[in-house]
Amino acid sequence: MAGDEPLPGDGQRRRYLIGYALAPKKQQSFIQPSLVSRAAGRGMDLVPVDPSRPLPEQGPFHLLIHKLYGEEWRGQLDAFSAAHPAVPVVDPPHAIDRLHNRISMLQVVSELDVPLHAHHHHTFGIPSQVVVYDAAALSDSGLLAALRFPLIAKPLVADGTAKSHKMSLVYHREGLRKLRPPLVLQEFVNHGGVIFKVYVVGAHVTCVKRRSLPDVSSDVLQDASAEGSLSFSQVSNLPNERTAQEYYDDMRLEDAIMPPTAFINDIAAALRRALGLHLFNFDMIRDARAGDRYLVIDINYFPGYAKMPGYETVLTDFFWEMVHKDDDTPNLNPNPNDEDVK
C-alpha cells in the first residue's frame, strides 16, 4: 500500500499526508495547484482518497477532509476513526447531517448564545419560516398566517444536489400552486440587494459581500396580473435579468457597509461550537427595515473556498493546525528512519 513507500522528504523533515475525499466537481474547484503548492511548502502533501477502496489500504493519513455522502462512506469513516482515533476527520458525518435539513439548519441560529451587549445595537436572527410537507398544506391559511409575502420557497433537503438548489420567489398566494413539497417557505426580507457570505475555516473567519436578489417593491406585490412566482437556483442568481439590471444600475456593491468584524466573528465562533463543524459558511443579510438587524438565511458545509480571498493560505494554516492539534500526534509513517521534525 502507499504507506509502505518512503514519503517525500524522509530523513530531512517530517511530512504529513492530508487525504481528501471529494466529488470530481468539488475536487476540481478546491484542489488548485496554488493550494497544493502552498501546503507542500509547509510539509503537507494533499492526497486524493479513492472512496471505492478501503481507507486502511490508503494513506497513512494525518488528516482526512471530505465531502462525500452515503451509508457506505459513513461506514468507512466510522471504521477509520475507530482504528485511528488520533487522526482528525473533518468533519464528522453526524455533525454535517444537521445542515441537510433547512429547518434544523437555521434552528441552531435561534439557539446561539452570543453576548450581544458587546455589540451595542446590532442583533441577529433568522427570517420567519414554516415547513410544508404536502400540497394540501399550501392552501392552509392558518399555516401561512404568520408569514408575509413575498416568500422564498426552498426544498426541505439541502444535500448539494441540483434539485436542492431550485428555489422560487413567491409574490402572492397564487404562486404557491406551482410549488412541490416538501419545502420550506421563508419570508423574503428586503436587504438592499446585498448578501454577506461568511466563510469559516476553523477559527478563521472571512466575510465578503455579493450581489443578491433585488428588493421587492410594494407595487409588485399589489400587481394581481404579475407572475405569481419566479424560479432561480441560488440567492445570488437573478430571476428577472432586466429588472435586476435596472436595480443594480442604481446601486453599487462597494457602497454596502460591512457588518462589524467582532459581531461576525462572535456569530461564527458560536455557530462553530454549536454545529461541531470546522468548515462551513453562512449567508447573512441586513434587514432593510432595521439597519442594525441581520438575518442568517443559509448555512453550507465545505463551501466553495476557492472564491474566498487568499484561501490557499487560510486552508494551509488550518491543515497545519489540525495535524498539530495534539502534541502526541502519532507518527504514522512506517519508515523507522523518519525524523519527527515539526
From Swiss-Prot:
The Gene Ontology biological process annotation of the record reads: inositol trisphosphate metabolic process
Sorted keywords for this record are:
ATP-binding, Kinase, Magnesium, Metal-binding, Nucleotide-binding, Transferase
Broad class of enzyme this protein falls into: transferase
User: How many cofactor units bind, and how?
Assistant: Binds 2 magnesium ions per subunit.
Q: Which family does it belong to?
A: Belongs to the ITPK1 family.
Give the tissue specificity: Expressed in roots, leaves, flowers, anthers and embryos.
Which parts of the sequence bind ATP? 102, 154, 186-197, 212
Stated role: Kinase that can phosphorylate various inositol polyphosphate such as Ins(3,4,5,6)P4 or Ins(1,3,4)P3 and participates in phytic acid biosynthesis in developing seeds. Phytic acid is the primary storage form of phosphorus in cereal grains and other plant seeds.
Which residues are recorded as binding Mg(2+) 1? Answer: 283, 298
SUPFAM superfamilies, per the entry? Glutathione synthetase ATP-binding domain-like (SSF56059)
Q: Which organism is it from?
A: Oryza sativa subsp. japonica
Which amino acid positions bind 1D-myo-inositol 1,3,4-trisphosphate, per UniProt?
25, 67, 165, 197, 300
One family name in Pfam for this protein: Ins134_P3_kin_N
Enzyme Commission number(s) from the entry: 2.7.1.134, 2.7.1.159
One Gene Ontology term of the molecular function aspect: magnesium ion binding
- InterPro entries found in the cross-reference section: Inositol_tetrakis-P_1-kinase, InsP(3)kin_ATP-grasp, ITPK1_N
* Catalytic activity from the UniProt record: 1D-myo-inositol 3,4,5,6-tetrakisphosphate + ATP = 1D-myo-inositol 1,3,4,5,6-pentakisphosphate + ADP + H(+); 1D-myo-inositol 1,3,4-trisphosphate + ATP = 1D-myo-inositol 1,3,4,5-tetrakisphosphate + ADP + H(+); 1D-myo-inositol 1,3,4-trisphosphate + ATP = 1D-myo-inositol 1,3,4,6-tetrakisphosphate + ADP + H(+)
Quaternary arrangement and interactors, per the entry?
Monomer.
Signals that turn on the gene? By drought stress.
So which cofactors does this thing need? Mg(2+)
Name of the protein described by the UniProt record: Inositol-tetrakisphosphate 1-kinase 5
Where, in this chain's numbering, is Mg(2+) 2 bound?
Answer: 298, 300
Name of encoding gene: ITPK5
